[in-house]
């Protein structure tokens, strides 16, 4: 039944894709050239006419305060730009394209305009991107570890999220969350993080949606009928399946949450040895 569903989805995708080409639309792709948008988030210039926007939560609702103690708010002098995930008392996982010179990290926050008693703020002591300490612009490896300048303490609103013990199953029910825009193409940033439930999509479906995309080290997640997606401002945040971080919000098409256009996530399990080695001091 799963195979039949995948084949049916592929047929729909191919028909839709053929029509889009007939209408003069271009495929989206991404490369290593990063451009800062007016919203303080990164976009990727493509070699084609359509721009891929670094991701953003659509179709969801406010997260319960108690459901995101691992969610980290990344900002600088220009304001909020990304999210991250607390892995232990001194390490945060986010996307490499979220790298900035003056990052600050706020933990234990829900409403960004409210100060919480156990809220803690840190700055990076060390940043490691794309399996290298020197290069943070390889979009095929959109992952970054941030070592905090001092340890954080567990509290009511601060607690790490588990790394994956196995790769995610195709079709798994997962949740993505962040402070990204809740409307698209008009951008509306919420005061509180939003959560939305989506599914890990089969590789053939993902490949049909993005024919030029490399499938290495990435996941596609969303709903094929659209309406639910990560979006502008959600970059670096977690895709959570069965209580473990399986993905990092990376990129997608804009406007978000469109029919047959799922979001793209860095596949955390593919980097598990690197992550554990760094955290262990290797």
Swiss-Prot record:
EC number: 3.4.21.-
Subcellular location: Secreted
Domain of life: Eukaryota
GO CC annotation terms, alphabetical: extracellular region; secretory granule
Disulfide bonds: 63-195, 82-98, 174-241, 206-220, 231-256
Top EC class, one word: hydrolase
Glycosylation-annotated residues: 41, 45, 135, 149, 153
GO molecular function terms noted in the UniProt entry: serine-type endopeptidase activity; toxin activity
Tissue-level expression: Expressed by the venom gland.
GO biological process, any: proteolysis
SMART domains: Tryp_SPc
Family: Belongs to the peptidase S1 family. Snake venom subfamily.
PANTHER family assigned: KALLIKREIN-1 (PTHR24271:SF47), KALLIKREIN-RELATED (PTHR24271)
Subunit structure, interactors included: Monomer.
Name listed for the protein in its UniProt record: Snake venom serine protease BmSP
Organism per entry: Bungarus multicinctus
């Amino acid at each position: 039944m799963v195979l039949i569903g995948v084949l049916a989805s592929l047929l729909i995708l191919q028909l839709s894709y053929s029509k889009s080409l007939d209408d003069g639309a271009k495929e989206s792709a991404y490369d290593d050239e990063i451009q800062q948008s007016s919203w303080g988030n990164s976009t990727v210039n493509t070699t084609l006419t359509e721009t891929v926007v670094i991701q953003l939560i659509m179709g969801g609702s406010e997260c319960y305060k108690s459901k995101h103690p691992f969610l980290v708010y990344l900002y600088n002098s220009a304001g909020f730009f990304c999210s991250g995930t607390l892995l232990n008392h001194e390490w945060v996982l986010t996307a490499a394209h979220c790298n900035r010179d003056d990052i600050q990290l706020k933990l234990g926050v829900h409403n960004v305009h409210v100060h919480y008693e156990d809220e803690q703020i840190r700055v990076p002591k060390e940043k490691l991107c794309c399996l290298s300490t020197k290069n943070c612009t390889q979009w095929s490896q959109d992952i970054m570890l941030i070592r905090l300048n001092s340890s954080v303490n567990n509290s009511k609103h601060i607690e790490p999220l588990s790394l994956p013990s196995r790769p995610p199953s195709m079709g798994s029910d997962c949740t993505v969350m962040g402070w990204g825009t809740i409307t698209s193409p008009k951008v509306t940033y919420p005061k509180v993080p939003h959560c939305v439930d989506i599914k890990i999509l089969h590789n053939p479906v993902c490949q049909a949606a993005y024919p030029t995309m490399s499938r290495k080290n990435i996941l596609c997640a969303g709903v094929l009928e659209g309406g639910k997606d990560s979006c502008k401002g959600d970059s670096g945040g977690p895709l959570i399946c069965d209580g473990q971080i399986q993905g990092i919000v990376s990129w997608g098409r804009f406007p978000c949450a469109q029919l047959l256009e799922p979001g793209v996530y860095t596949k955390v399990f593919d980097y598990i040895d690197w992550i554990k080695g760094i955290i262990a001091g290797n």
